Amino acid sequence: AASDVYKRQGVEMLEERSHIPVVGVAPYLDIQVEDEDSLTERFDRKQEVDLIDIAVIRVPRISNFTDFNPLESIPGVSLRYVQHVSELKNPDMIILPGTKNTMEDLLWMRANGLEATVLKEAAKGKIIFGICGGYQMLGETLSDPHHVEAGGTIKGMGLLPMDTVFAEKKTRTRVSGRFLELEGELQALSGAELEGYEIHMGETVLKGEAGHSVSIEDQVSGECKEDGAYCKNVCGTYVHGVFDREDVAEAVVRVLGEKKGIDVSQMTGIDFAAFKETQYDILAAELRKHLDMKKIYEILEQGI
């Protein structure tokens, strides 16, 4: 076919100009390996409130916003991104997301009044959940002796009795595990299995009455450890993708529904962990079909 001729000519031209082997041409694939919405579309959605209302604090350096896809997928759940105190309204749960600069974003929250408002909501018994940088913010102090971020030490929000020190070495790994036996407001999460990944610079040490929130196994090193923290209505973890498993997302909705006295038994989403795995399998099969896998493995083993 003419298209194959043009493709072959294009590959030859690229190899001639770059002096690098071209191992194939992958076609457009309609595969949902991550969220298709742009950040602008996601953040500019109407701030409508549904049966269960979850507010994510939209810090300036927000990262890993795909953490919230599983919650957004559940009918009857509204997930709103909030930048100002006036936008917060009266959510059932507040999430502090991951951030590229924990200390700067906490200072931003402090300056615009969102920190004080979140503290008031926590005092009323509202569920507060932090992921990675958002989890670090919940503690008592954040110290940066190596100038990984801004340097120095600042006061945290004080919702969890723990301290974080930023390290020079970055943690990057995949994990799986489960929620530990939680007491109080978040008891429904106890035992729920989770999987996700960690990517952070900090080490957090618990103290006082806080307990770890999850038990995880590093899928790379095999190391097992307890991670995160919880105390009463406040919970956090370093694990991104913590809501991907259907059991976790539905347990969160169940907790919030029970607090409001509404029936959420029909409010179910999809298992994002299983869905993503299926999509990755399709992607892998298609790439194998269109790429010179023998050449790729040869490069992996011997170099170019």
What are the functions of these language-model segments?
Residues 1-6:
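Short, small-residue-biased leader/transition segments that mark boundaries at the very start
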Residues 8-13, 32-45, 96-97, 172-176:
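Short, surface-exposed amphipathic charged segments that create phosphate/polyanion-binding patches used
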Residues 15, 21-30, 80-86, 163:
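Beta-strand->loop->alpha-helix junctions that form or flank phosphate-binding loops
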Residues 18-19, 27-66, 72-73, 225-304:
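Acyltransferase
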Residues 24-33, 91, 96:
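Terminal amphipathic helices with adjacent charged low-complexity linkers/tails
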Residues 62-122, 127, 219-232:
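Long hydrophobic segments that form regular secondary structure
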Residues 99-185, 190-195:
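Cysteine-nucleophile active-site neighborhood
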Residues 182-232:
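Catalytic beta-strand/loop cores that center a nucleophilic Ser/Cys/Thr
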